[in-house]
Amino acid sequence: MSKINLNKISHSYNPNDANPTYALNPFSMTWEDGKRYAILGPSGCGKTTMLNIVSGLVRPSSGKILFDDKDVTELKTESRNIAQVFQFPVIYSTMTVYDNLAFPLRCRDFSKEIVDERVNSVAETLNLKSFLNLPARKLTADQKQLISLGRGLVREDVAAVLMDEPLTVIDPDLKFKLRRNLKEINEQYK
Protein backbone atom coordinates (compact mmCIF):
# COMPACT_ATOMS: atom_id res chain seq x y z
CA MET A 1 0.00 0.00 0.00
CA SER A 2 1.07 3.61 -0.38
CA LYS A 3 1.09 6.91 1.46
CA ILE A 4 -1.48 9.11 -0.28
CA ASN A 5 -1.32 12.89 -0.09
CA LEU A 6 -4.21 15.04 -1.30
CA ASN A 7 -2.77 18.52 -1.79
CA LYS A 8 -5.36 21.32 -2.05
CA ILE A 9 -7.68 19.25 -4.23
CA SER A 10 -11.12 20.48 -5.22
CA HIS A 11 -13.71 19.51 -7.77
CA SER A 12 -16.55 21.23 -9.56
CA TYR A 13 -18.75 19.39 -12.04
CA ASN A 14 -19.37 22.74 -13.77
CA PRO A 15 -15.94 24.44 -13.58
CA ASN A 16 -16.50 26.79 -16.54
CA ASP A 17 -19.48 28.57 -14.99
CA ALA A 18 -18.95 32.10 -13.70
CA ASN A 19 -19.73 30.86 -10.18
CA PRO A 20 -18.89 27.14 -10.12
CA THR A 21 -20.52 24.99 -7.47
CA TYR A 22 -18.01 22.72 -5.79
CA ALA A 23 -18.80 19.09 -5.02
CA LEU A 24 -15.51 19.11 -3.14
CA ASN A 25 -14.13 22.33 -1.68
CA PRO A 26 -10.32 22.74 -1.62
CA PHE A 27 -8.71 20.67 1.12
CA SER A 28 -5.53 18.76 1.95
CA MET A 29 -5.16 15.41 3.68
CA THR A 30 -2.56 12.67 4.07
CA TRP A 31 -3.31 8.96 4.41
CA GLU A 32 -0.35 7.12 5.88
CA ASP A 33 0.74 3.79 4.42
CA GLY A 34 -0.96 0.78 6.03
CA LYS A 35 -3.57 2.74 7.99
CA ARG A 36 -7.37 2.63 7.83
CA TYR A 37 -9.38 5.81 7.42
CA ALA A 38 -13.10 6.53 7.49
CA ILE A 39 -14.46 9.53 5.62
CA LEU A 40 -17.67 10.65 7.30
CA GLY A 41 -20.20 13.24 6.26
CA PRO A 42 -23.76 13.76 5.09
CA SER A 43 -25.01 12.61 1.72
CA GLY A 44 -23.77 14.86 -1.07
CA CYS A 45 -20.78 16.31 0.80
CA GLY A 46 -18.18 14.96 -1.67
CA LYS A 47 -17.01 11.65 -0.15
CA THR A 48 -17.55 9.62 -3.32
CA THR A 49 -16.15 12.42 -5.49
CA MET A 50 -12.98 12.43 -3.37
CA LEU A 51 -12.56 8.64 -3.69
CA ASN A 52 -13.15 8.86 -7.44
CA ILE A 53 -10.47 11.56 -7.68
CA VAL A 54 -7.97 9.40 -5.79
CA SER A 55 -8.69 6.40 -8.03
CA GLY A 56 -8.52 8.50 -11.20
CA LEU A 57 -12.15 8.06 -12.26
CA VAL A 58 -12.56 11.84 -11.87
CA ARG A 59 -9.89 14.49 -12.42
CA PRO A 60 -9.73 17.25 -9.77
CA SER A 61 -10.50 20.83 -10.79
CA SER A 62 -7.43 21.89 -8.83
CA GLY A 63 -4.74 20.43 -6.61
CA LYS A 64 -2.45 17.42 -6.74
CA ILE A 65 -2.62 13.76 -5.71
CA LEU A 66 0.65 12.15 -4.58
CA PHE A 67 1.30 8.44 -4.02
CA ASP A 68 4.49 7.98 -2.00
CA ASP A 69 5.40 11.58 -2.92
CA LYS A 70 5.02 10.90 -6.68
CA ASP A 71 2.51 13.13 -8.51
CA VAL A 72 -0.19 10.91 -10.04
CA THR A 73 -2.73 13.67 -10.75
CA GLU A 74 -2.51 13.22 -14.52
CA LEU A 75 -2.11 9.42 -14.50
CA LYS A 76 -4.91 7.32 -15.93
CA THR A 77 -6.94 5.12 -13.60
CA GLU A 78 -5.21 1.87 -14.58
CA SER A 79 -1.77 3.38 -13.89
CA ARG A 80 -2.66 4.31 -10.30
CA ASN A 81 -3.08 0.71 -9.09
CA ILE A 82 -6.08 1.53 -6.92
CA ALA A 83 -8.76 -1.00 -6.04
CA GLN A 84 -12.18 0.46 -5.43
CA VAL A 85 -15.07 -1.34 -3.73
CA PHE A 86 -18.32 0.43 -4.46
CA GLN A 87 -21.55 0.66 -2.46
CA PHE A 88 -23.12 -2.10 -4.55
CA PRO A 89 -21.03 -5.15 -5.49
CA VAL A 90 -19.52 -5.08 -8.96
CA ILE A 91 -19.09 -8.67 -10.09
CA TYR A 92 -19.21 -10.66 -13.29
CA SER A 93 -22.34 -12.72 -12.63
CA THR A 94 -21.70 -15.25 -15.42
CA MET A 95 -18.23 -16.08 -14.07
CA THR A 96 -17.40 -18.33 -11.15
CA VAL A 97 -16.10 -16.84 -7.94
CA TYR A 98 -12.63 -18.11 -8.90
CA ASP A 99 -12.78 -16.40 -12.30
CA ASN A 100 -13.99 -13.14 -10.73
CA LEU A 101 -11.02 -13.14 -8.36
CA ALA A 102 -8.61 -14.17 -11.13
CA PHE A 103 -9.81 -11.53 -13.60
CA PRO A 104 -7.46 -8.66 -12.60
CA LEU A 105 -4.44 -10.98 -12.74
CA ARG A 106 -5.40 -12.53 -16.06
CA CYS A 107 -5.81 -9.05 -17.56
CA ARG A 108 -2.18 -8.44 -16.64
CA ASP A 109 -0.99 -11.78 -18.07
CA PHE A 110 0.12 -13.37 -14.79
CA SER A 111 1.04 -17.05 -15.02
CA LYS A 112 -1.53 -19.69 -14.09
CA GLU A 113 0.60 -20.63 -11.06
CA ILE A 114 0.59 -17.07 -9.70
CA VAL A 115 -3.14 -16.70 -10.42
CA ASP A 116 -3.89 -19.95 -8.55
CA GLU A 117 -1.70 -18.98 -5.59
CA ARG A 118 -3.13 -15.45 -5.23
CA VAL A 119 -6.78 -16.46 -5.79
CA ASN A 120 -6.57 -19.28 -3.26
CA SER A 121 -4.80 -17.08 -0.71
CA VAL A 122 -7.38 -14.28 -0.99
CA ALA A 123 -10.29 -16.76 -1.03
CA GLU A 124 -8.95 -18.29 2.19
CA THR A 125 -8.65 -14.85 3.82
CA LEU A 126 -12.20 -13.89 2.81
CA ASN A 127 -13.77 -17.28 3.61
CA LEU A 128 -14.70 -17.82 -0.04
CA LYS A 129 -12.77 -21.09 -0.62
CA SER A 130 -15.88 -23.28 -0.60
CA PHE A 131 -17.55 -21.04 -3.21
CA LEU A 132 -14.73 -20.82 -5.78
CA ASN A 133 -16.44 -23.08 -8.33
CA LEU A 134 -19.91 -21.55 -7.97
CA PRO A 135 -21.32 -18.94 -10.36
CA ALA A 136 -21.02 -15.58 -8.60
CA ARG A 137 -24.71 -14.83 -9.21
CA LYS A 138 -25.65 -17.60 -6.72
CA LEU A 139 -23.99 -15.88 -3.78
CA THR A 140 -25.55 -13.55 -1.21
CA ALA A 141 -25.05 -9.78 -1.36
CA ASP A 142 -22.38 -9.85 1.37
CA GLN A 143 -20.50 -12.67 -0.39
CA LYS A 144 -20.63 -10.70 -3.65
CA GLN A 145 -19.18 -7.71 -1.82
CA LEU A 146 -16.36 -9.96 -0.59
CA ILE A 147 -15.67 -10.90 -4.21
CA SER A 148 -15.39 -7.18 -5.06
CA LEU A 149 -12.96 -6.72 -2.18
CA GLY A 150 -11.06 -9.85 -3.18
CA ARG A 151 -10.49 -8.53 -6.68
CA GLY A 152 -8.69 -5.59 -5.11
CA LEU A 153 -6.63 -7.70 -2.73
CA VAL A 154 -5.59 -10.32 -5.28
CA ARG A 155 -3.09 -7.90 -6.85
CA GLU A 156 0.03 -7.32 -4.79
CA ASP A 157 0.77 -4.00 -6.54
CA VAL A 158 -2.36 -2.21 -5.28
CA ALA A 159 -1.49 1.19 -3.79
CA ALA A 160 -4.73 1.37 -1.79
CA VAL A 161 -8.15 -0.21 -1.47
CA LEU A 162 -10.87 2.47 -1.42
CA MET A 163 -14.28 1.47 -0.12
CA ASP A 164 -17.34 3.59 -0.78
CA GLU A 165 -19.99 2.52 1.74
CA PRO A 166 -19.15 -1.18 1.22
CA LEU A 167 -21.53 -2.38 3.95
CA THR A 168 -24.70 -0.76 2.55
CA VAL A 169 -26.03 -3.97 0.97
CA ILE A 170 -24.96 -6.17 3.87
CA ASP A 171 -27.47 -7.71 6.27
CA PRO A 172 -27.32 -5.80 9.59
CA ASP A 173 -26.45 -8.98 11.50
CA LEU A 174 -23.43 -9.57 9.26
CA LYS A 175 -22.07 -6.00 9.32
CA PHE A 176 -20.25 -6.44 12.63
CA LYS A 177 -18.62 -9.66 11.43
CA LEU A 178 -17.56 -8.07 8.14
CA ARG A 179 -16.13 -5.01 9.92
CA ARG A 180 -14.02 -7.35 12.03
CA ASN A 181 -12.91 -9.21 8.89
CA LEU A 182 -11.95 -5.93 7.21
CA LYS A 183 -9.83 -4.99 10.24
CA GLU A 184 -8.05 -8.36 10.09
CA ILE A 185 -7.51 -7.99 6.34
CA ASN A 186 -5.99 -4.55 6.86
CA GLU A 187 -3.54 -6.00 9.38
CA GLN A 188 -2.63 -8.82 7.00
CA TYR A 189 -2.16 -6.70 3.86
CA LYS A 190 -0.65 -3.46 5.18
List the predicted regions and their residue ranges.
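Conserved ABC ATPase signature
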Residues: 74, 135-139, 143-145
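Helix-to-loop junction immediately C-terminal to a conserved catalytic motif
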Residues: 55
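Hydrophobic anchor residue at the start of the ABC signature
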Residues: 149
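Short coil-to-helix segment of the ABC ATPase nucleotide-binding domain corresponding to the Q-loop/switch region
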Residues: 95-104, 135
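Conserved ABC ATPase "signature" region
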Residues: 71, 106, 113-131, 181-188
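ABC ATPase C-loop
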Residues: 153-154, 161
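The feature captures the beta-strand-to-loop junction immediately N-terminal to the Walker
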Residues: 40-42
